[in-house]
A protein has these predicted regions:
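N-terminal secretory signal peptides
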Residues: 1-29, 44, 52
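A bilobed periplasmic-binding-protein/Venus flytrap-type ligand-binding module shared by bacterial periplasmic
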Residues: 165-172, 207-211, 287-300, 318-321
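Extracytoplasmic ligand-binding site segments that recognize negatively charged/polar headgroups
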Residues: 67, 87, 91, 110-251
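A ligand-binding cleft/hinge motif common to bilobed small-molecule-binding domains
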Residues: 115-118, 251, 257-274
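Conserved C-terminal helix/tail region of periplasmic/extracytoplasmic solute-binding proteins
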Residues: 248, 351-384
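Periplasmic-binding protein-like
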Residues: 223-232, 271-295
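Mature extracytoplasmic/periplasmic domains
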Residues: 294-358
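Early extracytoplasmic/lumenal segment of secretory-pathway proteins
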Residues: 54-118
Length: 384
């Protein structure tokens, strides 16, 4: 098994496209060449902009926000300049940057919601007024997403999400072939399975395969069974790599199956590559990003205005089909604004029954209490 690179949140690591470079034009060029933006650094020009907080907002975000036209409407309508830094590290690193930087360095960040409860507990992010945001336009299940609420108070809002299930080459496999994770263990696909190097989604999906409805809340026996499943899967896996490595390998025909979802498949399919994705009968796990405001920002008014924009339909309809990677979006008005083919590709065609049909078999990705043991099991799997 080839392990190319440790990758902390694969749906947004190492796929960031610089719109000012020759790789910024199309996703097809990205697949052909690969792309990565380095982890954020606090440059002097960025720090100097903090002084003009009354007319600006400082944002640390994962990829997509930097693409042309994403933030233009916000800046033109509000007169607020967005000082944007794209983050290519982990959620923990993003939150630590907000926590350890001087107040106002970052007014807004966009971590995975699984990290919001600890950020609330540590006093890093500010409480939000639900009435300030278009939650009535959201899918109900996302508006009430448990990790962003605590004791009836709102601290963050999901504005981008998706799922992990199976991404597959539909010229080689039918939908019925991949309706169960059993396909990953079929001897005929030995060495043809690729995995993204991030333990939570891979182990979460395999935990669902083992029959655990709450895939990250396992007792000792269930966790032992999960390790057995990992051991069984190991000979089937030919590649563990970062996002660009896996996508390029699949696009080149080297691999046919991956534990992944629309954030990988939709863009490749749109570019004419033969990949589809689905949630197997055993279920899958979600990924998401949630916007939140620093508890120490001196610039909360502008930060809230920014959150209002990125939770609204105009922005989300663009973010859904960002060149960086596609995603589902929770604002139903944004879904309606998408072309019909994009809505179908992103499972947003039937928005009235989205909660009860599509989301019913997905479990929120979370950080398990015995996280270190999970990480150790994943490292052992990779090195076997």
């Amino acid at each position: 098994m080839e392990t190319l690179m440790n990758n902390d949140n694969p749906q947004y690591k190492n796929v960031l496209i610089n719109p000012n470079s020759q790789l910024g034009g199309t996703r097809r060029k990205f697949i052909a060449h690969g792309a990565a933006i380095g982890a954020v650094s606090l440059s002097a020009p960025f720090i100097s902009k903090i002084a003009s907080a009354s007319t600006s907002v400082n944002v640390l975000a994962f990829g997509g926000y930097e693409e042309p036209g994403m933030l233009t409407e916000f800046e033109e309508k509000t007169g607020i300049t967005v000082n944007l830094k794209i983050h290519d590290g982990s959620d923990e690193e993003m939150i630590a940057l907000m926590e350890t930087s001087s107040p106002g360095t970052f007014d807004v960040i966009t971590p995975t919601s699984a990290y919001i409860p600890k950020a609330i507990e540590d006093g890093i992010i500010a409480e939000l007024n639900p009435a300030d945001f278009p939650l009535d336009d959201y899918f109900d299940i996302i508006a009430k997403w448990p990790p962003v609420w605590k004791t009836g108070k709102l601290y963050a809002i999901v504005n981008r999400f998706g799922y992990y299930g199976i991404t597959y080459n539909h010229k080689k496999f039918s939908e019925s072939d991949v309706s169960s994770y059993d396909i990953l263990f079929d001897p005929s696909v030995k060495g043809r399975v690729a995995l993204f190097d991030w333990f939570l989604p891979n182990m979460g999906c395999l935990s669902k395969y083992n029959g655990n409805p709450n895939p990250y809340d396992l007792d000792a026996a269930a966790f032992s069974d999960l390790n057995d499943t990992l051991t069984k899967l190991r000979p089937q896996v030919g590649l563990v790599g970062n996002t660009s490595q896996v996508i390029q390998a699949m696009a080149g025909g080297s691999y046919d199956l991956a534990i992944a979802g629309e954030w990988v498949q939709a863009g490749m399919y749109d570019d004419g590559l033969p990949f589809k994705a689905l949630v197997p009968e055993q279920g899958g796990v979600t990924w998401d990003q949630a916007v939140c405001v620093s508890a120490t920002t001196p610039n909360k008014e502008n930060a809230v205005k920014f959150l209002q924009y990125v939770t609204g339909p105009a922005f989300q309809s663009k973010l859904a089909i960002a060149k960086t990677y596609y995603s589902m979006v929770p604002n139903k008005k944004a879904a309606v604004m998408l072309p019909n083919d994009k809505r179908e590709l992103l499972n947003l065609s039937n928005i009235e029954k989205f909660d009860e049909i599509f989301m019913s078999n997905l479990s929120p990705r979370k950080s398990p209490d015995n996280r270190d043991e999970w990480m150790a099991s994943w490292e052992q799997f990779k090195n076997a």
